[in-house]
Amino acid sequence: MIITTTDVIQGAVIESYLGIVTAEVVYGSNFLRDFLAGIRDIIGGRTASYERLFEQGQRKALEELEQRAQRLGANAVIGIEIDTGTINLDQSGVLLLITATGTAVKMR
């Protein structure tokens, strides 16, 4: 399976467009991680725990996207976009949201 951000794959011919595929990954926040990230933000520096979480989430979203495309009979997903964001849950924290979207295609 080819997964790419481009809309064209050199040397390949798209036989059919099978539709838009989307995958979402949601993580709950962690009080200790949030606290330590806040301290790093105050003194400067990167928050490695959140960076790892977003990297892991992007990988999982792309894996899920590939599975959904395969169920449609695709052998490639083109035009991939990955979006990240947060969902506020009032006093109880936030959810981290990672979304991957692309177009499932059948190529030859």
From Swiss-Prot:
Q: Name one Pfam family in it.
A: YbjQ_1
Which domain of life does this protein belong to? Bacteria
The family classification in the record reads: Belongs to the UPF0145 family.
The UniProt entry, under PANTHER family, shows: UPF0145 PROTEIN YBJQ
Record's protein name: UPF0145 protein Npun_F4817
Q: Which organism is it from?
A: Nostoc punctiforme (strain ATCC 29133 / PCC 73102)
